[in-house]
Every structure is written in C-alpha cells, then in structure tokens.
Regions:
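Enriched for short, Lys/Arg-rich terminal
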Residues: 3-4, 12, 20-23, 38, ...
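A short, surface-exposed loop/turn module that caps and links secondary-structure elements
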Residues: 28-55
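A residue-level signal for beta-strand positions that form part of recognition/binding surfaces
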Residues: 1-3, 48
Length: 98
C-alpha cells in the first residue's frame, strides 16, 4: 500500500473547508488514492497530478508521487483558483526537493 503524506498547506486547506460533505468526498478520494485508484485525474508537468472532485465549485487536490510507496498531497482548491493552485503545488514540490 501507499503511504500518504499531507503538506502543511494541504492540511490547512482541508481543515478550513466548512462544507462537511465536500470534506467527506475529498477524504474518500484520498483513501482511494491510498489503494492506487485515484479516479478522475490528470497529470500536469513536473510530475504533479490534479485529482478532480465533481462536487460544489469543482474541488481539486494536487499531489505527486515520491518513489513507489509515497504520495505527497501538496495543496487543494477549486476550479476558480486552479491556476494559482497549480503554481503553489509546483512551489511546494520544489521545496520538498531542496
């Protein structure tokens, strides 16, 4: 099985969600990632993946793989903040590489 690590940025974002249904749906998708079945996603440049959650404003979770047994959850957002969230995810990946 895969180990999932949350960045502090991701953890703060998820804890800040007020919509309990949205939070529950996101957590279900994270558990699916844990068993290597992420569902609807796309791969972005730099090894970052975008998980799409079709609920509410279109939530997104950005993550990357580190070796074959670790997933790092980078940050989250929704369709309206997508461009900024991708840039933030790229920045977090760079920090983890340093």
């Amino acid at each position: 099985m895969i180990e999932i690590v949350k960045s502090s940025t991701f953890d703060t974002w998820l804890r800040g969600l007020r919509d309990r249904q949205a939070k529950a749906r996101i957590e279900v998708r994270i558990r699916r990632l844990w068993v290597e079945n992420p569902g609807q996603r796309r791969t972005l440049k730099g090894g970052i993946c975008e998980m799409k959650i079709d609920y509410g404003p279109g939530y997104r979770v950005y993550y990357t793989y580190r070796n074959l047994s670790l997933v790092l959850l980078l940050c989250g957002g929704n369709k309206s903040t997508q461009d900024q969230d991708i840039k933030l995810a790229q920045h977090i990946v760079k920090q983890w590489e340093d």
